[in-house]
């Protein structure tokens, strides 16, 4: 996945979930933050950030914050990009073989999953979660309580009971981490439900990514510790 019109900046302040003030070429600019998570460990004053410039006159802001440098790590913060990189990854023959159909935003009962996939022998629902929280190489999800995430896991279990295969894919938006684990300190119910989902047949997958200031692509599988 490739971005265009990327600029380098310096983070100043995030007054709410949706915008941040960033210094770009000596000027203070308002940027849309493409991640509504807390990201407090990433967006600290003077952090180096990467911004995508958008020339669409209908947008309220012409800049979007997509990446940040934490120590020696480049971390992609774009929560909208994870589905795109998973789609590309599956199309290249990863995760599943003999894929005959990939349908994004697939409806299941009264909800939607990120993907519905068919192979020659299986019908599969997939939910994707982006991961940006890292400490000493250990990455965790979520960075804030997520009732929606718990709901998705329970619905994936329902899919299994109805004869589908089911996956939750944690896309770690950085490279070379130690392992992934649920953030039970922040949301114990999510961690418990994730473990229960695995026990009931849901496939739990974590992958890291090669991240540059203007690109992100899935690199390899990462160990999952529940």
Swiss-Prot record:
Transmembrane segments: none
Superkingdom, natural source: Bacteria
Signal peptide: none
Gene3D superfamilies: 2.40.50.580, 3.40.1350.60
Molecular-function GO term, any one: DNA binding
InterPro entries, sorted: SfsA, SfsA_C, SfsA_N
Family stated for the protein in its record: Belongs to the SfsA family.
Name listed for the protein in its UniProt record: Sugar fermentation stimulation protein homolog
Organism: Clostridium beijerinckii (strain ATCC 51743 / NCIMB 8052)
Designated gene of the protein: sfsA
């Amino acid at each position: 996945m490739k971005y265009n019109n990327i600029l380098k900046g310096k983070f100043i302040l995030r007054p709410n979930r949706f915008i941040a003030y960033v210094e770009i070429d000596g000027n203070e600019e308002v940027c849309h933050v493409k991640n509504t998570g807390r990201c407090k460990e990433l967006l600290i004053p003077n952090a180096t950030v990467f911004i995508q410039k958008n020339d669409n006159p209908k947008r309220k802001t012409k800049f979007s914050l997509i990446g940040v440098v934490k120590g020696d790590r480049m971390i992609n913060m774009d929560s909208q990009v994870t589905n795109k990189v998973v789609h590309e990854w599956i199309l290249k023959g990863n995760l599943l073989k003999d894929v005959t159909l990939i349908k994004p935003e697939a409806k299941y009962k009264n909800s939607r999953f990120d993907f519905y996939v068919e192979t020659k022998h299986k019908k599969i629902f997939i939910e994707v979660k982006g991961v940006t929280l890292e400490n000493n190489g250990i990455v965790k999800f979520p960075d804030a309580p997520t009732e929606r995430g718990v709901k998705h896991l329970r619905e994936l279990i329902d899919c299994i009971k109805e004869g589908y295969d089911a996956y939750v894919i944690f896309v770690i938006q950085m490279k070379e981490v130690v392992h992934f684990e649920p953030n039970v300190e922040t949301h114990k119910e999510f961690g418990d439900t994730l473990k229960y989902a695995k026990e009931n047949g849901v496939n739990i997958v974590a992958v890291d990514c090669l991240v540059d200031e203007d690109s992100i692509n899935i690199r390899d599988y990462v160990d999952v510790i529940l």
